[in-house]
Amino acid sequence: MLPSLIQPCSWILLLLLVNSSLLWKNVASFPMCAMRNGRCFMSFEDTFELAGSLSHNISIEVSELFTEFEKHYSNVSGLRDKSPMRCNTSFLPTPENKEQARLTHYSALLKSGAMILDAWESPLDDLVSELSTIKNVPDIIISKATDIKKKINAVRNGVNALMSTMLQNGDEEKKNPAWFLQSDNEDARIHSLYGMISCLDNDFKKVDIYLNVLKCYMLKIDNC
């Protein structure tokens, strides 16, 4: 049965605090939480509406980061090789597109989003760390990657909080795959970072789909 109670949502405050200086579009249009006994309360419906909007903004920013990285390092031999790329999340049993997501039970869809977000917890740290070691990398790329990492971590905390609140087995053991970037060859590291950002782009498009399908489910929106 789908929960409909008003729940304390301190993680929503975390999302807003993390991004308050980053000018999220349309955040002001979302309903704010009600304060009771010093605690913030928000309905699940409002929570998913906000999460859906934030995830969509992050997805756009990750795509922009990928485009900027690809453009800046376009002269690196073989960078745009279209051969299949195996991502650190390839083994995860998650819906591949919106059609599959719509056919997935809300609890399984929420778990799928959590699995992808958890799988990127450590690789995001590696991504930001490795970018700073590449010669002539533009400051804007490092800045965007750092920004994205903070926002994704905030969404991950939020989704995991929803998992704990809505699902009885929300605290099940997590299996987070590693991503190895070690190499003395600069071009090889650029290739690896390119592949990593490409995978992040694809994965966060999935997260965006999942959270917005869940939003439609919670708000009972037919044409979404």
Curated annotation (Swiss-Prot):
Under the heading SUPFAM superfamilies, the entry gives: 4-helical cytokines
- What is the role of this chain? May have a role in embryonic development. It is likely to provide a growth stimulus to target cells in maternal and fetal tissues during the development of the embryo at mid-gestation. May play a role during wound healing and in the hair follicle cycle as a growth factor and/or an angiogenesis factor. May play a role in microvilli formation and cell proliferation of neuroblastoma cells.
Q: GO molecular function of the protein, one example? A: growth factor activity
- Report the leader peptide range: 1-29
- What name is this protein filed under? Prolactin-2C2
TM regions (residue ranges): none
Q: How is it modified after translation?
A: N-glycosylated and sialylated.
Q: Where in the cell is it found?
A: Secreted; Endoplasmic reticulum
Q: Does the keyword Disulfide bond apply?
A: yes
Q: Which residues are glycosylated?
A: 19, 57, 75, 88
Tell me its family.
Answer: Belongs to the somatotropin/prolactin family.
Matching PANTHER family, A to Z?
Answer: GROWTH HORMONE D22-RELATED (PTHR11417:SF39), SOMATOTROPIN,PROLACTIN (PTHR11417)
Lineage here is:
Eukaryota, Metazoa, Chordata, Craniata, Vertebrata
GO cellular component, as recorded: endoplasmic reticulum; extracellular space
Q: Which UniProt keywords apply?
A: Disulfide bond, Endoplasmic reticulum, Glycoprotein, Hormone, Secreted, Signal
Question: One biological process GO term for this chain?
Answer: blood vessel endothelial cell migration
Q: Which InterPro entries match?
A: 4_helix_cytokine-like_core, Somatotropin/Prolactin, Somatotropin_CS
Query: Which cysteine pairs are joined by S-S bonds?
Result: 33-40, 87-199, 216-224
